[in-house]
Amino acid sequence: MATIFAIETSCDETAAAIVKNRQVCSNVVASQIKIHEQYGGVVPEVASRSHLEMLNQVIAQCLCEANLSWSEIDGIAATCAPGLVGALLVGLTAAKSLAIVRQKPFLGVHHLEGHIYASYLTEPDLQPPFLCLLVSGGHTSLIYVKDCGIYETVGQTRDDAAGEAFDKVARLLQLGYPGGPLIDKLAALGNPQAYPLPEGRISVPGGGYHPYDSSFSGLKTAVLQLVQKLKKQNNSVGADGFLPASTINDIAASFQETVAKSLTKRAIDCALNFGLTTIVVGGGVAANSGLRKHLQAAAAKHNLRVLFPPLKYCTDNAAMIGCAAAEHLQRGHTSPLTLGANSRMAVSDIMELYNSH
């Protein structure tokens, strides 16, 4: 059983965790949401500086909560791709330094593989093959999980990621940042059938549509046009220039319903067509109540098993990175200390991060 000390700094969460196979010994996350809120989104340079300021404190707290010494740690891991390069470098450099000083194996981990492994933390018997629906602020993908490190992307967004669309629509509705939780909250108060919105399908040469790829830019534009149209109707706008709360709730509900149904349809069709009986959901949008409701209901109809990670493992954290690293280390995979940070990297290239022994 491998015990891993892991660091995650790919975007705006400074995180460290200690994981013993699938058991979390400690999991510390310092969020930068309050810092980036004023900008309406993540500012890369600000994120990197904040990681530098917070990381030592997060590492110390992580060790303290686990009540473990370095002699009990088998390997040290950090997210190395994809993400904001400056942010990644902070965690990557810290992990390499610790690996050298403590004389431990080092492992670079792909951020999306971490999200795949988030459900492993609470599902001790989960094993491939299965389908992963990965939905976050930066990614929306359907990934065929064949084995540890062996993945095939069978569907993805052609433009905005689902989480990105939530943030942009929240901005259109003047709700604030981050948009996902805010829209989810208001959607519960609105009518999801109030405004029909386009699903966003991808046409293919020769006719028809791609069965698993998605598009959210058209949906975002449709919401923009709807907001503009409603604002032109004098009775729809208050003296402050804002739409009434009930209208905003209905738009939020209609938007969330459209995204949830679109993702659910593609995930169910994909699992059935590939003969997979389990769908694992990962990423920040996995926390969305609309997606959870639609996917669980549709899966039950088709006798498919759907696994959502606990809410604390949906958003970025280091426990999921440690879980993935533990599996790799047990298979004899380690990374060279020359490994760099990458803003982009396909999940099909993950094994390039490791030397196999």
Residue ranges and their predicted role:
Residues A2-P82, H111, H115, I251:
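N-terminal beta-alpha supersecondary unit
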Residues T14-V19, C132-L134, T140-Y144:
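Short beta-strand scaffold segments in enzyme catalytic cores
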Residues M1, V109-L131:
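Conserved phosphate-binding catalytic cores of ATP/NTP-utilizing and phosphoryl-transfer enzymes
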Residues G108-V109, Q296-M320:
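Conserved phosphate-binding/catalytic loops in two-lobed NTP-binding clefts
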Residues W70-C80, F274-A286, L307:
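Short glycine-rich phosphate-binding loop at a beta-alpha junction
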Residues K185-I279, G290-A297, K301-H302, D349-H357:
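A contiguous, well-structured pocket-lining segment that forms one wall/lid of small-molecule binding clefts
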Residues P124, D147-N191, K220-K229, N234:
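Glycine-rich phosphate-binding loop plus the immediately following alpha-helix
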Residues P309-V347:
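Glycine-rich phosphate-binding/hydrolytic loop that grips phosphoryl groups
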